[in-house]
Amino acid sequence: MLKMIKNKDFYVLLLGRLITNFGDSLYAIASTLLVYKMSGSTIYSGLTLFLTSSTAIVQLLLSPILDKINMKKFLILSQFFQAILILIIPFLYKFGKLNVYHIMVIMPIISLINQLVYPGQISLLPKILSEKELVTGNSLMTMAYQGSNAIFDTFAGVIISLCGFMTAFFADSISFILTGILFCFLSKKLSYFQKREEKSKENLIKNHFKSLKDGLNLFKDSRIFALVFGIVFINFSATSISAVLPAFAKNEIFYSLMLAGMGAGLLLGSLFAGFPKLKEISLGKLYIYGMMIVALAWILFSNFQNNIKVGVVLYGLGWFVVGVVNVYAQTMVQIIVPNEKIGSAMGAMVGISTFMAPLGALLGGYLGEYFSSSKAIFIGSFIIFLVAIFWALNKNIRKLPSVNEFNKVLEKIN
């Protein structure tokens, strides 16, 4: 691990991810709560989440581009562009022009850019790390991308409570600027990319969709299809729950602590993924029983609106399994997919797994408005329980071996 940290490119990517995540925590909490505060409706919260989560579908179409652009240049420019974009919110606020629709437009744009940034960073790992270092590298990047939110979300809630929403947006802009400067120190070799040989627009479009098809081909195997099918509805449910969290929480501190609980669960899951004993457990059992635990934890969570401590623990417990699965899913794709197609594959995997999330946001907003946030969380959790039942009845999932036997499964798939 020390050797990896001394790798300049990996260190820059890791540190850049951490700095950006701090700013993102401030922005995500501030903008989500501001939308709910200005509108007073979970319909608007759900609609905003619908718009931001819809960018994952756009990522599915744009993912082949990741293999054909100057990734270093893209990472740098994307950070500076977001730094400017985020300042529009406090600027409009200063002149009394800010309304909920401005935030609902800016949030999806930033979300779309970030949907491409993280897969882009992940696609660079095979170019700077050996195959033996990939699992550890992915684990560290996952911790930086998701696990660090446990700390940053807590700080964000405190900062917003003490300093206000606009301070959060200024701090976020500064974090983007710092990360953009940091990415300037990436090696020049990471600027190289596949140059298009085709000259005509028709061939460029044809080539783009061929690359997209190559990324989607990964999911033709019936075992992977059953797994991804379940994940689609898990994301649908999780997003419906996220849409009503501002109403469920009632204040900045509780909301930020719930997001921190989610981050802590993902962090512990990422760390736990490397434990030898866990690698010996059948993935089928891990997925089925894991989702049952998630569903039951969140059903209980829906009844603890007035108990912050218990609520945060139960909500965080539900995200623990996700942290475990993320590490192995990314590593699997990186090993079986050629380096020149890794960007397409990573983008396709994330895009497909979040396909139903936007509709989940709309459903959550509707249920929260016309019933209650607690009932919306209960319904979302019950859908996850149904996914666990579906996997238990699916022999392709039940027969998945342990992680230690995963290479044999990949050989059969290929």
PLM regions: where:
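A single, central transmembrane helix in multi-pass transporters
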Residues: 163-170, 211-271
